[in-house]
């Protein structure tokens, strides 16, 4: 294969890696945790990944405590946990 062909193949493989969504085996374990509002009483809109529905869902975060399955934006949730 020519060097141009190898460069094209390398470029395509790199692009595929970047555009491929997170697979369940690569998903962090905290994505499996339930939504947890925390100990405080604020009502801050946040997102968590629901593994049964395979999507990010909005919930109201209390402002303190909780767990790592808690994202400020749906985009952040999807890029971290959604397949």
Curated annotation (Swiss-Prot):
Disulfide bonds join 31-81, 40-64, 56-77. Its main location: secreted. One of its GO terms (molecular function) is serine-type endopeptidase inhibitor activity. It is found in: Secreted. Pfam families: Kunitz_BPTI. Residues 1-24 form the signal peptide. The keyword Ribosomal protein does not apply. Expressed by the venom gland. One of its GO terms (cellular component) is extracellular region. The record marks 41-42 as: Reactive bond for chymotrypsin. Gene3D superfamilies: Pancreatic trypsin inhibitor Kunitz domain. Residues 31-81 form the BPTI/Kunitz inhibitor domain. Belongs to the venom Kunitz-type family. PANTHER family: KUNITZ-TYPE PROTEASE INHIBITOR-RELATED. Serine protease inhibitor. Does not inhibit plasmin, and does not reduce blood loss in the mouse tail vein blood loss model. This is Kunitz-type serine protease inhibitor textilinin-3. It comes from Pseudonaja textilis textilis (Eastern brown snake). The lineage of its organism: Eukaryota, Metazoa, Chordata, Craniata, Vertebrata.
